Curated annotation (Swiss-Prot):
Expression by tissue: Highest expression in liver and kidney. expressed at significant levels in small intestine and brain (at protein level).
Species in which this protein is naturally found: Homo sapiens
Protein name: Iron-sulfur cluster transfer protein NUBPL
Family: Belongs to the Mrp/NBP35 ATP-binding proteins family.
Listed Pfam families: ParA
Gene it is expressed from: NUBPL
Cofactor: [4Fe-4S] cluster
């Protein structure tokens, strides 16, 4: 898929050598990146916003071929959400080889799945003009990172991001999947609301570290999903403990059992604890997630147990 195909597909932004960015808005080209829209572009944007608001909430429509959707979310960045999403997808496949698993990265501004899953290149288009996911380790993957250069920033306004999310949700040929794991961006913004309102989500997994500042945002994330009627399956307490590789002494660097206390407050359960371990970081950075590269390690087994707990809380696909 060439750059012009990608720009047309997403209505996105093309960066100029001078640092500006152009974006198609209703047939006009408007300068973004800190500059004011022209009069015509601004008026077009207002009309578009009015049209969207007049429709009310979108009607949920299942993703074709996908039985169940599991979103992995966090209230803030840097808590290991993407690492959890990638290893959860691999753990679901490892626990039951008969299941077909997909992984969708909807973090438009900071996609991590291509790096963690060791995938590069652009998706091919099917005869019906749908994008085909890239495949590695038995997992079908789609990400905004496949559609832009690795070092190229995505400099888009909200409506462009929403258009991109719509394409990622509706214009991908997943085939037949038992589980689609969705790596959400951090926070409780437009993307989270758009995904929650456009597709039926089977359940949400909230990732947090034990420290208070992360738990505050995790609380907000869980409440957001409840307000949009998405079942919260439970919390994952990441970076729960650090064990010295030499003396084996354990230290709770980010605090002890903060996620369990939050889970009690919310009436939820902790799906599992993931330790702070060098192996997890190195495996992710090299594009060989620990569930795949070191399946017998204690760290991989922690993800495998979490996958079991997630499936146990999911309704039957026929329900």
């Amino acid at each position: 898929m060439g750059i012009w195909q990608r720009l047309l597909l997403f209505g996105g932004v093309s960066l100029r050598a001078g640092g500006g960015a152009t974006a198609p808005l209703g047939g006009s080209r408007a300068m973004v990146c800190g500059r004011q829209l022209s009069g015509a572009g601004s008026e077009t944007l207002k009309q578009r916003r009015t049209q969207i608001m007049s429709r009310g909430l979108p009607k949920q429509k299942p993703i074709e071929g996908v039985k169940q959707v599991i979103v992995v979310a966090s209230g803030k960045g840097g808590v290991g959400k993407s690492t959890t999403a990638v290893n959860l997808a691999l753990a679901l496949a490892a626990n039951d080889s008969s299941k077909a698993i997909g992984l969708l990265d909807v973090d438009v501004y900071g996609p991590s799945v291509p790096k963690m899953m060791n995938l590069k290149g652009n998706p091919e288009l099917s005869q019906s003009n749908l994008m085909r996911p890239l495949l590695n380790y038995g997992i079908a993957c789609m990400s905004m990172g496949f559609l832009v250069e690795e070092s190229e920033p995505v400099v888009w306004r909200g409506l462009m991001v929403m258009s991109a999310i719509e394409k990622l949700l509706r214009q991908v040929d997943w085939g037949q999947l038992d589980y689609l794991v969705v790596d959400m961006p951090p926070g409780t913004g437009d993307v989270q609301l758009s995904v929650s309102q456009n597709i039926p989500i089977t359940g949400a997994v909230i990732v947090s570290t034990p420290q208070d500042i992360a738990l505050m945002d995790a609380h907000k994330g869980a409440e957001m999903f409840r307000r949009v009627h998405v079942p919260v399956l439970g919390l994952v307490q990441n970076m729960s403990v650090f064990q010295c590789p030499k003396c084996k002494h354990k230290t709770h660097i980010f605090g002890a059992d903060g996620a369990r206390k939050l889970a009690q407050t919310l009436g939820l359960e902790v799906l599992g604890d993931i330790p702070l371990h060098l192996n997890i970081r190195e495996a992710s950075d090299t594009g060989q997630p620990i569930v795949f590269s070191q399946p017998e390690s204690d760290e991989a087994k922690a993800y495998l147990r979490i996958a079991v707990e997630v499936v146990r809380r999911l309704p039957s696909p026929s329900e």
